[in-house]
Amino acid sequence: TVLDICPVTIGDNVFFGPNCMLATPVHPFRYQERNIKYKEDGTAYDDEYAKPITIGSNCWLASNVVVIGGVTIGEGCVIGAGSVVTRDIPANSLAAGNPCRVIREITEKDSIKYKKELF
């Protein structure tokens, strides 16, 4: 699901697992600012705003990942299942958790050719 009140930029060859959410809106914490208000002409408005999301090429976001507005995920990243991404993730990183944190860099040693159990 993409809630795109602000631009969402997705690079080439990005894989999304089921139930991923990209949410650009940011809501105020105080209910006085979050509740709907009305202008003199009767038009409704609120103080919601949004921040863009950028996902670099060749990323994989596993199942149930949530990406919050204002975040950039660098190229070649893997984001673990159930992660909530609240801050930028540098390129070629394995990251997971709630909140999502970088676990380590993805390197040549992660190549499938080194997984002897598969051959």
Where are each of the predicted segments found?
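C-terminal/domain-terminus segments
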Residues: 63-100, 112
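Acidic/histidine-enriched, glycine/proline-rich intrinsically disordered or flexible terminal extensions
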Residues: 113-119
